[in-house]
Amino acid sequence: MFTAKFIDNLYFNGANIRAKGKSGKLCKVFAKQGQLDGACVIYSLMMMLILEHKLDWEDLREKARNSKDDFAKSIQRQFLNYGLKGGTRRGHRMCDVSKKLNVCMKENLSEYYTCDKRTWHTVSRHELYEKIRTQLDLGKPVMIGSHGENGPGHAVVAVGYSREGLKTMRLFCLDPSGFIPYMQLWNNVIDVDYLAENDMLTDYDYHFEDKIIVDRILIINDPPKPALSFDPDSKAIPF
């Protein structure tokens, strides 16, 4: 029997996937690259912020329509550097986005982790996957980053998971590089090797049909009470 755990803030409005944004009303959540212009990290972050009740879809559309807005200029520049398979040759790194997000939230609510031993944010691969599972069990989304042997890095938002035996955790994701299927809460599936402790390409991306490594994540923690305001127009952030 198929059993999966999904985050709390996902709904169907007719056949369309929706989430409750900043206003508390149901709004569009899935953003495909090209709708706002930009790279996968920015698109995944925007979906994360809607799922975390920090933004509404119309907030994003208003910024994208305003050609004088720094947000629009930044993501349009990234669109010009758009690479193959939804990657980017020069986009925002997840670690940098996490730092900027904490500035605009005025609190260290965003956390970034990676199992890449070349950085100081190192956790083991097993610990990284445990953090993904724990966050999803709390009903909260996770931005996950991966890379393949030759292709550029890619970022998606995990919104659910299932366990396929002891070895595999199957992640159900919103992937900005593709379309969302009719009456479905996800458009990509990534299998992670829960027992892997090395740098081998043992994870698998079903959308790109390629072996990858899920090696970094960004999560947003619950704010203290009262809830802190989120200022997407802060001059300290690049989007």
Residues covered by each model-derived region:
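Active-site nucleophile-adjacent alpha helix/oxyanion-hole segment immediately C-terminal to the catalytic cysteine
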Residues: 1-82
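Generic hydrophobic segment detector
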Residues: 36-67, 81-122, 210-239
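Conserved active-site-adjacent core of cysteine acyl-enzyme catalytic domains
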Residues: 5-11, 76-196
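Generic structural motif recognizing short loop/turn segments at the entrances and edges of beta-strands
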Residues: 1-2, 6-8, 13-15, 22-28, ...
